[in-house]
Amino acid sequence: MALDKIRLIASYERKIIRRHLSFWIFLICIVFGIAGVQWYLQVDSPVWAESALSATVPYMNAWFFNLLQSLLVIFVGVEFVWRDRRLGTNETFLSRSETNVEYMFGKIWGVMKLCLLLNLVSIGIAIMIHLLFMETVAFKPLLYLFYLFTLTFPALVFVFGISLFAAMLIRNYYLALLLLMIGFIGSYFATPWVLYGTFDPWARSLPLLFSDAIGFANIGILLLHRLAYFFCGIGLIFLSVLLVKRMDDRRSAFRKVLGILASGFILLGIFAGALYLNTYLDINQRRVRFRIAQEKYMKSDRVQVVSNRMVYKQSGDRLHVESFLLLVNKSKQSIDTPILYLNPGLSIVSLTSEEQELFYNREGHVVVIKRRMECGEELPLRVEYEGIIDEAICYLELPDEEYHDTRMGILPLSADPLGNMPKTRHELYSNGGRFAHVGNKYTILLPECLWYLSAVPPVNLQIPSMKDFDFTDYRLEVEGQESKTVISQGSMKKNEKGISYSNDHPLPRLSLCIGDYEQKTITVDSLSFGVYYFPGHDFWTEGYNLSPDSSRLLMSYHLGVLERQTGNSLPVNRLSIVEMPLNFRPYLRQGQLGSNFVQPELVFFPEKLFTESYRSIKDILKLLKTKRSLDSEVEGVALRSNVLNRFFEPIYNIMPMYQEFRTTIYSDKFPCIGDLIYEIRFSGQSKDHLSLNEKVKTIQYWDGRSLRGALMDRDNPVEYIMLKKKREHINSLIATRVEMMYMWDFIEDFVKCHPFQRVDFDVFAREFKDQFNVNIDSLLERYYADDRLPTLFVQDLKMESYNGIPLGSCKVYNPSNIDGVLRVDGYDQKLRRQRPNYFLIPAKSCKEIRVRNYTIPNFAVELGLCCNLPDKIWY
């Protein structure tokens, strides 16, 4: 095979292609279209995600080029076969002695070289935009090469190969072009999420964004996917060469070798694709086994871990932990086989109690200890384990498709100076895929991955919204990481062996993060507020010019705003924001506030706030339409919109720190009872305003479904806002018997009397009855079972004066078979302010209600969760 002939044919083919109008149309689209789109979307974009990371510019360039390149290759691949058949544009070569292999290789190399040159031109323009107009975005030239070789080049080879093969088989030009375009459109829109992107040559479902902390997520799986399409593309190109009928070279030895190579490459591609798909299927099978094992031991009485001292070491992606635990049987009966949970990828080296080896069985993440524990008995354990974290254990309640979904959840599009954050969905970037990471460069371990022994699984598979914790006295010693920043809960101390963390009180969860972090800390009143970020990611303080004292005053003021919004001071003396790699995805469990990004004393933010909105001081000055406002005003807006407002967003909501991270109230009889009780405590702090469609949806959901049934419905999980409305309704019914304000004080006192404990609801119910002489247990029994909503008729709303006192009044009739409730704000003479009044409207009854009201003419009646629309009536 003569290389000079191949180069000559390739040169001639490029000249022919450049003469076509379609080529220049594609060239304009590639050069000006992609550049224009990137300029519009990324230069001075209000969407922070477009310019936050070093990978977004090269990735967007590769993404759009892949799309246009595929269209170009389809047209060119079909056309050059058609030209040879009909137009005779290559008669110069067709009449010569070049073999079919030389001739086709020349034409193919000509097309591919032209596409590669166009790709380099597109990359060059993107680099110019990156360097000249996006100076704040880190420039990493190797990322452009990475996307060239892993994203655009394999797609070029595959699409060109399948286009040639189709053109050789289908002799009609228009039919071949039509079928290829239908296949392109169909695969483009239908295949990204089918079988985890196995049939998507553009790899849009794979997490291809680069993290400065850990690089690419699942790089091995990514390379398998790209090799599969590259090998299949090479094989199809070789097969297309064999189908050329220009010369009879069937006896050529190289032709036979080419046939073997074609078959071999296609088989290699299929094998790589099968390995890629099998990776996901194997994870799914393991998750099924983990679910079966957990449900098998779900109903067993459990022990509690009251203390856990750990010595942590790691080497590469393997960790080694020596754990000293104290188990206590606080149940009302003996436990034959105490159950603990540990990541299934971690093997137990030894398990002893007071130097006596204990026998145990393991089923996935379930550790069954063969040692009977009597009621009230304590059992000290020493457990040594090591291995590699298996991330398949995380979020067992999720269906496989959702677990493997790598798309970047909900992205706030922009944030105005007041902190309002309209939201949209970003479909271009896929960043997820990781739930834990252990490595020499970076380590992050959250409780979800069971990196330490626990008596409670991460999720209750029967009722995913049900939260249960053991408040444990954790002591953590990390050895061999003196050169890194080690982050965990508690007070840090350095010693000869390494870094240790201890806590002043028991914690419900423990996290560990090790990496190259920079840190800024400020002490405000008694709170130590810290920010940990990766080197070069100090965009938090960009443009801030306040002195430390002024910053402390500003922070104190906004923490006071936070306290007023929650009605309570922050119940921790340390709060840190920790930057984590962009490859990690937060999940909001059914009916819960705060994701796995919210841990005791720690709130994890994604790398450079990539998935969120961010406003720099410069951006806020533009929005305020001024060159420079008062420093405190502008920087206060930045602090509120970029940090503090996020503490009330679902993913980063810190309400668990005020609620179950302080005291967990649990009950097997009343699932999620702790959430309902804390709903009472914080009911006066915020209101959720639903649209008409949301109200209709809420009514349709609850009319015919009980709270207990909704919590246990795994096929149709209840949304958080719907669950919140149901809890508010039940709390309103309870408030008809006990003043809401008195219940607020009672719950706060109860939490203070049982700090950092797991408390049985029976204790709460007993103290509640002692305080108010109300059997809340019997009330909840009925309210948990109610599966209908009342219908209320309200009439004769009016304001009148009685002895100079303004009164609001109305008449209410409840014709339904279930009790209803009305809320009317009235004036409290003792408190000298408005307060809510709750009135029970029993089934099949009517009432006339009068309340003292000094907010003339704003007399309003709220009907709670019922079949009425509107659910609030004004006078």
Show where each model-derived region lies.
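Acidic/His/Gly-enriched intrinsically disordered linker/tail segments
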Residues: 141, 646, 650, 660-737, ...
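Extended, low-hydrophobicity, Ser/Thr/Pro/Gly-biased non-transmembrane segments
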Residues: 385-517
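Hydrophobic alpha-helical transmembrane segments
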Residues: 1-80, 84, 245-290
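Juxtacatalytic substrate-recognition/specificity segment
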Residues: 45-46, 50-56, 90, 362, ...
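A surface-exposed beta-strand-loop module
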Residues: 334-335, 344-413, 462-466, 554
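Amphipathic alpha-helical substructures
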Residues: 712, 717-796
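N-terminal, polar/Ser/Thr-rich
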Residues: 199-207, 219, 224, 252-320, ...
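Secretory targeting signals
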Residues: 23, 34-75, 79, 105-171, ...
